Amino acid sequence: MRDSVFIYSPSYQTYMFHQEHPFNQQRVLLTYDLLKTINAFDDGDIVTPRLASEEELSLVHTDDYIQAVKLAGAGKLPAEEGESYGLGTEDTPVFAGMHEAASLLVGGTLTAADWVMSGQALHAANLGGGLHHGFRGRASGFCIYNDSAVAIQYIQKKYSARVLYIDTDAHHGDGVQFTFYDNPDVCTLSIHETGRYLFPGTGQIQEKGSGKGYGYSFNIPLDAFTEDDSFLEAYRTAASEVAAYFEPDVIISQNGADAHYYDPLTHLSATINIYEEIPRLAHTLAHQYCGGKWIAVGGGGYDIWRVVPRAWARIWLEMKGIDPGHEIPPEWIVKWQKQCPVALPSSWSDPADLYPPIPRKPEITEKNAQTVSKALYAIRSEQQRTK
């Protein structure tokens, strides 16, 4: 058994809406190249993804939607019909070959799932995945097919496993949550910026599931301008208590890197420090409850130069137990600086004065603590009753 595998293909770059679109898969290449530069890969660590089949996509997505995506990518879907499927919008424009490009990202997460669930590897990372806004019959928020949702259904069908999905993207993991809203064998936890200010506007504490799945959806909507300490306190508390409550067979973590202060689309005030702690706890919980079974995917993250490579590299470094030291390799900076519109960071950490002090910090911290308490009230009440 390998400790970890890294699912990667240069073809991930084909998932490209247009040059000005904020969703840019060059960030996966930048992360891969940073890890390669610090010699973080052993022989056999890199695994090529496969294409997801239409049958696999249909574990989540409707047949008519899959056909619409194929037609759109071939330039044969009328614009009005495309919009009814969320295709051809400002968020999710049509591009040539979009079905194949999106199927490869899903196939990457399925590849990761098979490596982990078959016992070939303890951990697997597919940073090209994490497209958590995709719905059964509709594209949304840059996401065509929902790789995590397809992988969870695949794992349940093939391996009969209970799945804990932990999402730390700044945007609510709506597509995954609502796919499994009535499923008691899938527990979703999303820690995100409140939907009062940010797409998709969902992810309230009251969204707890339905039917047999009631009580297996957890949401921690954080206030705008939340900083490291408050974010990590919410994450540690919620992830630890939810994992203990659900006792999963495998953990899938979605690792959006858009809670950072630099991110142009969100309003949180985290630094790179949280992206060292987030995978560390996921790793610990996987060994505590799942025999180590941990699948990590990417997600959001729109400062593709200064934030995403360092944040996502930390996932692989945690899996492999590698300490990268303090400095980013100068040769990586030299290689990419000419393409980068801002100065690339020279350190794995952020400076202490990254941004000016947040005036509402005590109020924000207290509000977030109350949110966590409300979200976990049912778990804690059950624990009190069974003592």
Swiss-Prot record:
Q: Which GO terms describe its molecular function?
A: histone deacetylase activity
| Taxonomic placement | Bacteria, Bacillati, Bacillota, Bacilli, Bacillales
Name its GO BP terms in alphabetical order: acetoin catabolic process; epigenetic regulation of gene expression; sporulation resulting in formation of a cellular spore
Q: Does the keyword Calcium apply?
A: no
Q: Which residues form the signal peptide?
A: none
Know the name of this protein?
Answer: Acetoin utilization protein AcuC
Gene that codes for this? Answer: acuC
InterPro entries in the cross-refs: AcuC (IPR003085), HDAC_PDAC (IPR050284), His_deacetylse (IPR000286), His_deacetylse_dom (IPR023801), His_deacetylse_dom_sf (IPR037138), Ureohydrolase_dom_sf (IPR023696)
Family per record: Belongs to the histone deacetylase family.
